[in-house]
Structure formats: C-alpha cells, structure tokens
Amino acid sequence: MKLIAFNEILKGEKLTLKATKPDVKFATIYFNLVEKNRFHLKKWLSWEKEIKTVEDALKYFFEKEEKTKNKEVIEYGIYLKGEFIGNISIFNISLEHQSGEIGYWITSDMAGNGIVTEAVKIIEKEVFSNWQFNRIQLTCDPENIASIKVAEKCGFSLEGLKRKDFFSPYFNQFRDTLIFSKLKE
C-alpha cells in the first residue's frame, strides 16, 4: 500500500482537525495549552515533561513534520468553533500492514463532552476510507476510564493487556497498558 497524500483538514459534526505545522504562532498556542493543562496531562502522558518552552514545542513540530514526510506519523490539532483544544495523531504507521495507532489529548475543561470520541471517529473514517488501513489501535492505562470509554464508544475491541510495560513518572511505578483495536471490516 502506498500512502500518497493525506487530507490536511478533516471535518466532523462539531470539530475540525487540522494537520499541525511547525510555526512559532502555533507552537506558542500549543505550549500555553499544555502548560495550562499540565496537571491534567501528566497523569497519562509522559511526553508533557518534554514541552517546557515554546522552543520545545516548535522543535516537537519540526520533528513531527519530518516523521510526516516519512509517513511515520500524522498529527492534527483538534478545533472546536475555531479554537485549538487538543491534539490527535496517527503514529506507528505501517504502510506494509495497513495499520497505525491513535493517540490524543484534550484540555481538561473540554473532557467528558464527546470531543475525543468525535475526533477518533473522524480519524478512523480517514484511515479506513482514504488510506485503506485494515487496522487501527489505541492504548491506555487500565485506570484511564475516559480513554476506555472513548474506545468503547468508537467500537474498538479490547485485545489484551501488556503487563508492567512502561514506567510512569506520575505514579512512580511500572504500569500496565490496555490494547484496543478496530478493523476495517
């Protein structure tokens, strides 16, 4: 399978997803949102500690741009009524196996409103229809009830549990990971 191009803007019922670009203005907005939501994010996402400055955010987006060129990851900003409120990406992309993994985060004040569920559905439509993916997956901590609900609402199946597979600085211990997947069929 050959992924030639991807849509830079994806629209849903309430949301617009826009491919992220490395520019100072967006990096500033991104950093400020991460900073404002750091406590909310750090429980489940270890990358938040890497974004300490606007320059870190800009570097992050330059790295993602390179990975996008190599078809390894595609990252979208999540927008509600024109306001940036989070991020969703497809990573661990395998064109050979027509698969990838979805990751996301959203601001604490927008959590619990079905926004991530809609964003995941927009992404799954894109990867199954336009990219001809066969399989997508998402992973989360067994205590991340919000992500478990997203997986269930989007029709993902629980495949299994990886035991103590990553170290969480927040919990200061090794944690399990739930694996959910969805097939095109």
Feature names for model-found ranges:
Residues 42-62:
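Conserved GNAT-fold acetyl-CoA-binding loop/helix
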